[in-house]
């Protein structure tokens, strides 16, 4: 690495939370832009940086540093500049001159060893001295920690995270157990902790290392959608991570269970292992669902029938027996599940339940897992629907590694009924939090399509609840939302049943044959560029969504987004833009949040409500980009606006094209979906069905017909490893 030394003259940008800094350094009279992570930034400070020179596409030549050191001044002029830099509150240039004039080269020694002598300086009283010494002590602690960490080869970015977590105890804590950073610091994984431990001289067979490796292996459940791992799977993965023998891993598993970080259970004679958080979520969900399902409400059949008749008159539609039964069940049961595909009348039933419960003078709340789904629910019911996070009043807790909600068992929701749409998207952790906030005597109505892809997070909650038999399940099979020429709902139903639908390309369901990915790409871009523009009533910018089965490749979302951006939102002198790595963000771009950020502040543009949290899958538009402030503002579809520092843009991706998984919970007037070959584990019926059911007015598939047929015939989607059905059965047996 190269070395650069100079005086900090200007701070262009500094993020207080993660330390990301862009600044100007005076190096022998030449101003140099430096980029990296610093704990504090005080003008006039002399720094030595270790890093490399880079060329930014927009900002030119920069020095990107990984390590830095604060060089204490050695000259009297340097001491005056250092003391008056803003580092010490109450000390300006004149007072700094008096201090240095009095103590000279011994100034810093006086500050360290005999600070009360500063009272000899006119203008410095006891209060000023106390404030000044507190700040100086903080800076001294920071310098000491940074120097020690850099001796172990820790980068400035990691040092910033560590210091923010442990302050002056950082080094002592790391020497005792470097692996605790995986538990304590959000976003730090086993690999980073293991690298740090190696630099600190921790043995490979150290018990804390082995336990951390076991926990890391179990944590992979979160990414894979499972809630537990089989014994052999856990042992093999832990061995791969740790590079130790089986016996050592088995001992580590026992120690991890004893420590309370993992839980062992048996299902059908097989040992299974949970991360403790997922075990607690699954077990609590099973118990609370069992209790909720045991609730029944007195309601006169004649009164309910009459209420349904009044609702029919109000909407001028005659409900069939299936729909009437769904409404009656929801009114009388503590827990009911309503499942069905597109066009099967779920919205009509939600409105019916809402209408009748409100006519009984009951308080009813509507909710959905995502902002897009909640907005759609609001539009179709005329009543406010909230995201589950907003309903549960999420708040950011810097010390919590999982979401923290104000609404819980101690502060429950004050409702008589809660109707949740798109319930297939709810993972086991969020379901547990939701159930904890529901008071005894509240009806819970879960509505969704169990045949879609399961939640992004761990669990397969809706399908597991249906399989468990814990509550009445109303299965909607008849298609109602269907015009004479529409084939979307009919074909989706056929796909879900494993039948190949008839496609005549004369309706709203089209398959355009293309033999290879080059042809698919060209057709998709042509559709957006000019072919769909001739179709009356279609706005290609707002109405059309490209949904791809994959991220990578010629027709994956990454490549398509770049090319679609140039068609739908080309560069213009009137639009600001910012380059982040290989990605150009431009005002007017359609973007998506790609990971949960529980700390991100937002403000509603209409109500001025403020809150914390932007979530994986939230979609919006780049409203503005400011190079001066080094920030980008996103206006989300539900009215919230959030400001991203340029260093946070790795949390955003373009959403002109999105994966099928990311499209869940949304509907679009027109959907274009490339069809490609691949493993049936991923390219299967469930994925195709989920993609097709996103379209409301037109579904366009592009690719080889045989790939379409193969996906329909492939029901080889990997079943998630979950224990909810087993645990519900256990609690039901206990209650008998």
Regions found by a protein language model. Name each.
Residues 306-334:
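Conserved pre-motif I regulatory segment
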Residues 52-57, 594-600, 676-679:
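Short, charged beta-turn/beta-strand-edge "cap" motif at the junction between a beta-strand
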Residues 324-327, 332-506:
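ASCE P-loop NTPase helicase motor core
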Residues 11, 49, 593, 622-625, ...:
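A generic structural signal for residues embedded in beta-strands
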Residues 616-736:
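C-terminal accessory regions
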Residues 1-303:
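Accessory, non-ATPase domains that flank or precede helicase/AAA+ motor cores in DNA-metabolism machines
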Residues 450-612:
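Conserved helicase motor core of P-loop NTPases
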């Amino acid at each position: 690495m190269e070395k650069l030394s100079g005086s900090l003259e200007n701070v262009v940008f500094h993020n207080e939370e993660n330390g990301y800094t862009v600044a100007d350094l005076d190096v022998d009279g030449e101003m140099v832009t430096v980029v990296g992570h610093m704990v504090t930034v005080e003008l006039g400070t002399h720094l030595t940086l270790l890093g490399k020179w880079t060329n930014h596409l927009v900002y030119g030549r920069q020095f990107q540093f990984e390590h830095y050191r604060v060089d204490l001044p050695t000259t009297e002029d340097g001491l005056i500049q250092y003391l008056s830099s803003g580092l010490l509150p109450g000390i300006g240039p004149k007072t700094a001159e008096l201090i240095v004039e009095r103590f000279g080269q011994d100034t810093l020694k006086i500050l360290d060893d005999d600070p009360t002598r500063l009272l000899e300086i006119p203008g410095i009283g006891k209060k000023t001295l106390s404030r000044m010494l507190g700040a100086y002590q903080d800076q001294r602690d920071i310098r000491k920690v940074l120097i020690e960490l850099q001796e172990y080869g820790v980068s400035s970015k990691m040092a910033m995270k560590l210091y923010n977590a442990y302050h002056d105890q950082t080094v002592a804590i790391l020497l005792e157990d470097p692996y605790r950073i995986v538990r304590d610091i959000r976003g730090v994984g086993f690999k980073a902790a293991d690298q740090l431990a190696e630099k600190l001289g921790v043995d490979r067979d150290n018990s804390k290392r082995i336990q951390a490796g076991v926990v890391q292996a179990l944590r992979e459940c979160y990414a894979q959608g499972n809630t537990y791992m089989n014994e052999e799977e856990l042992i093999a993965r832990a061995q791969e991570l740790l590079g130790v023998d089986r016996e050592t891993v088995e001992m580590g598993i026992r120690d991890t269970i004893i420590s309370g970080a993992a839980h062992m259970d048996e299902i059908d004679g097989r040992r299974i292992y949970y991360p403790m958080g997922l075990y607690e979520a699954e077990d609590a969900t099973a118990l609370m669902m069992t209790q909720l399902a045991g609730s029944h409400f007195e309601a006169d059949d004649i009164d309910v029938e009459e209420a349904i008749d009044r609702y029919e008159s109000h909407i001028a539609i005659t409900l069939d027996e299936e729909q009437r039964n769904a409404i009656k069940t929801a009114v009388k049961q503590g827990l009911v599940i309503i499942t069905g595909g597109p066009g099967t009348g779920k919205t009509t039933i939600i409105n019916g339940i809402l209408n009748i419960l409100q006519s009984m003078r009951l308080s009813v709340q509507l909710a959905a897992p995502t902002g897009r789904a909640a907005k759609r629910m609001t539009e179709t019911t005329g009543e406010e629907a909230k995201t589950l996070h907003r309903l549960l009043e999420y708040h950011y807790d810097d010390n919590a590694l999982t979401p923290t909600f104000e609404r819980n068992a101690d502060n429950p929701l004050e409702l008589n009924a809660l109707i949740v749409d798109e319930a297939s998207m709810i993972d086991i952790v969020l379901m547990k939090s939701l159930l904890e906030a529901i008071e005894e005597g509240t009806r819970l109505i879960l509505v969704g399509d169990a045949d879609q892809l399961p939640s992004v997070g761990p669990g397969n909650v809706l399908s597991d609840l249906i399989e468990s038999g814990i509550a009445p399940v109303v299965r909607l099979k008849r298609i109602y939302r269907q015009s004479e020429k529409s084939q979307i709902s009919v074909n989706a139903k056929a796909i879900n049943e494993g039948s190949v639908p008839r496609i005549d390309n004369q309706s709203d369901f089209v398959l355009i044959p293309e033999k290879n990915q080059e042809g698919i790409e060209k057709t998709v871009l042509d559709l957006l560029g000019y072919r769909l523009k001739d179709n009356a009533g279609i706005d290609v910018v707002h109405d059309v969504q490209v949904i791809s089965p994959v991220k990578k490749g010629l027709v994956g979302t990454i490549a398509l987004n770049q090319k679609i951006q140039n068609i739908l939102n080309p560069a213009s002198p009137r639009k600001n833009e910012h380059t982040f790595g290989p990605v150009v963000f431009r005002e007017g771009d359609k973007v998506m949040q790609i990971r949960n950020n529980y700390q991100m502040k937002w403000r509603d543009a209409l109500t001025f409500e403020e809150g914390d949290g932007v979530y994986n899958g939230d979609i919006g538009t780049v409203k503005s980009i400011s190079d001066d402030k080094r920030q980008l503002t996103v206006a989300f579809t539900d009215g919230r606006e959030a400001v991203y520092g340029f260093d946070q843009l790795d949390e955003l991706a373009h959403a002109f094209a999105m994966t099928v998984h990311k499209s869940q919970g949304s509907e679009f007037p027109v959907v274009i979906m490339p069809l490609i070959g691949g493993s049936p584990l991923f390219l299967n019926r469930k994925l195709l069905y989920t993609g097709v059911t996103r379209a409301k007015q037109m579904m366009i598939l592009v690719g080889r017909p045989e790939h379409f047929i193969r996906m329909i015939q492939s029901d080889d989607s990997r079943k998630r490893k979950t224990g909810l059905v087993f645990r519900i059965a256990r609690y039901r047996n206990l209650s008998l």
